[in-house]
Amino acid sequence: MAYRLLRALFRGLFRVTIDGVTDQFKHEKLIITPNHVSFLDGALLALFLPIKPVFAVYTSITDTWYMRWLKPYVDFVALDPTNPMAIKHLVRMVEQGRPVVIFPEGRITVTGSLMKIYDGAAFVAAKSGAAVVPIRLDGPEFTHFGRLQGVLKTRWFPKISIHVLPATTIPMPQAPRSRERRVLAGEHLHTIMMAARMATVPRETLFEALLSAQTRYGRFKPCIEDVSFKEDSYQTLLKKTLGVSRILQRFTVPGEHVGMLLPNATITAAAIFGASLRGRIPALLNYTSGAKGLQSAIIAASLKTIVTSRQFLEKGKLTHLPEQVNEVNWVYLEDLKDTVTLTDKLWILFHLCFPRRAMLPQQADDSALILFTSGSEGNPKGVVHSHASLLANVEQIRTIADFTPRDRFMSSLPLFHAFGLTVGLFTPLMTGSRVFLYPSPLHYRVVPELVYDRNCTVLFGTSTFLGNYARFAHPYDFARVRYVVAGAEKLAESTKQIWQDKFGIRILEGYGVTECAPVVAINVPMAAKVNTVGRILPGMEARLINVPGIAQGGRLQLRGPNIMRGYLRVENPGVLEQPSAENAQGELDANWYDTGDIVTLDEQGFCAIRGRVKRFAKLAGEMVSLESVEQLAISLSPEGQHAAAAKTDSAKGEALVLFTTDSEITRERLIKVARENGVPELAVPRDIRVVKALPLLGSGKPDFVTLGKMAQDPEMSV
């Protein structure tokens, strides 16, 4: 009777629902592993699961007053973490057929993300051979029984959902020592718990996700700021979004690709969400690519309109672009302010109260946004992402990193790059964190000062940018920073060292590609390994394809929820080319993406980048990584600029060419460094050319197309 009354009370107050594979509880040996978000979790599971399980509870909790009050109603076993026999007792209970609930985190979350996973539950599952049923609890964290007051917008009776995931097993790992087996089993369970989080993420559009964040963290929660130093709340950002959307629909149609040439600013975020909610697909244009790059993007994405700002064009010295690129309609935001009518204002006011009614019908799998590749190996390609792929990458990041609304992001990487867009805009907005948008990562003195002034805790950048910030920053500028992540290029040893020595901060290296929205792997404090880019993100499948001539590693191919919808190419304008990759048998597999990168994956799943397939030279039948050649030069001259290319050679097929800004680099010095590092002499170039500067793309990456031409033609210069 008491159970029925409590169940009815909870269902009435919290609108509790349970979904998923509820017949999973029929296994003979069963362990249930829920996430832990509040003090209500145990009561919810006891009341709503179709079985009566035993709860494994730490002795520090069993002695509390409320556990003594619950003892007549809930079956639990005291678990002493200091007693090794406690695990054996649990194993015996499972083997006897008693379903056991173990909270693998061991404590209630204080971040909203997964906490540390204890390996005890995993070892019990592996030892007993029990089925493991992960459960995802959503909603109790918003109650006053959680530990996220001040982090989330708490309320008395939020809706609670209990998601039951399919059962799985944890095989006993193969390792010589018991301690190693426990650790490996724990990592397996951590993977299961991360997959459970990813499996229960709601399928939303970008605009719906923004509204969900507003509900979750509060409409008046400050969320975004730019160089105007006026911080906007979710409500103010929504108002600007609705305003831009209302104006954009006058000169565009639903489904149209709309070019956007805008800086890192709040209005850019409003333009992206505003276009999206009215069914337009923003194409974020690289303003450093010049007229030629813009024309390629216009052709590939079939653009008719480009939205920009007169002030931005003037400050960026880009006023020549509208004259040189005159095949599209240029729309200036400044000109649109005076066109807002009373009807528009009333429309905005109404939809501030009912924002979901402003959105045109859309699905999560519909095209949401177009980004463009850097063009380092040919014409830039349009990369079309869906709402689902972009938001999946955000959730993958949030699953492994403990970002909270207490964090402040410094976002100086351009929003037209996937790295800047996903980690610098979407991730903080969907996490409730504050973000400061700065228009240029090249202001090496200003960015550290702003990090200090705005109390930023999260900083993303390339190795080059981070190295320069460290050179000009005061030792106290990064005192509050807890996450520094490097991506887009290999992290230089000198950059890593100066951050450690000057600020006491470990840079975490990551890896991504535009086609994956972009993050593929990342080191985080909970799982980091030196000289790797971290583990592949949860929800992604990875496979390595053998490349003839390359002994270590293989060509990385990926599949997952964050993979793009497809390419838009200059050669086939407006036609979406869906992703596919050639498997080991030479057959094309749909929905796989071939990164073109040679990587190795160790036994713990950590990924190390060896180079790009296109950046290997074949010398007398041997494959030599051009990046390894560049690393030799960097070790000799960390401050210089170096890039390697290949040229045709009648004797060996191809020969190496090193371009460098350091005139003191010689073949003899390179040979010495190569011997010290165990690099074969074959990887030391004979042709060393000193240049004033390397040819660079707008992204700051070397222009390998131009370098390849320079390698073939000794007379050609930058």
Curated annotation (Swiss-Prot):
Region (Acyltransferase): 15-138
Catalytic reaction annotation: a 2-acyl-sn-glycero-3-phosphoethanolamine + a fatty acyl-[ACP] = a 1,2-diacyl-sn-glycero-3-phosphoethanolamine + holo-[ACP]; a long-chain fatty acid + holo-[ACP] + ATP = a long-chain fatty acyl-[ACP] + AMP + diphosphate
Molecular function terms, GO-annotated: acyl-[acyl-carrier-protein]-phospholipid O-acyltransferase activity; ATP binding; long-chain fatty acid [acyl-carrier-protein] ligase activity; medium-chain fatty acid-CoA ligase activity
Biological process annotations from GO: fatty acid metabolic process; phospholipid biosynthetic process
Keyword Cell inner membrane applies: yes
Xref: PROSITE patterns: AMP_BINDING
InterPro entries per record: Aas, AMP-bd_C, AMP-bd_C_sf, AMP-binding_CS, AMP-dep_synth/lig_dom, ANL_N_sf, Plipid/glycerol_acylTrfase
Keyword Zinc found: no
Origin: domain of life: Bacteria
Transmembrane segments: 258-277, 409-433
Residue segments, region AMP-binding: 233-646
Entries under Pfam families matching the protein: Acyltransferase, AMP-binding, AMP-binding_C
Membrane protein topology class: Multi-pass membrane protein
Active-site residue numbers: 36
Keyword list, A-Z: Acyltransferase, ATP-binding, Cell inner membrane, Cell membrane, Ligase, Membrane, Multifunctional enzyme, Nucleotide-binding, Transferase, Transmembrane, Transmembrane helix
Enzyme Commission number(s): 2.3.1.40, 6.2.1.20
One GO cellular component term noted in the UniProt record for this chain: plasma membrane
Compartmental location: Cell inner membrane
Protein function: Plays a role in lysophospholipid acylation. Transfers fatty acids to the 1-position via an enzyme-bound acyl-ACP intermediate in the presence of ATP and magnesium. Its physiological function is to regenerate phosphatidylethanolamine from 2-acyl-glycero-3-phosphoethanolamine (2-acyl-GPE) formed by transacylation reactions or degradation by phospholipase A1.
Family membership: In the N-terminal section; belongs to the 2-acyl-GPE acetyltransferase family.
NCBIfam families for the chain: PRK08043.1 (NF005959)
Name of this chain's protein: Bifunctional protein Aas
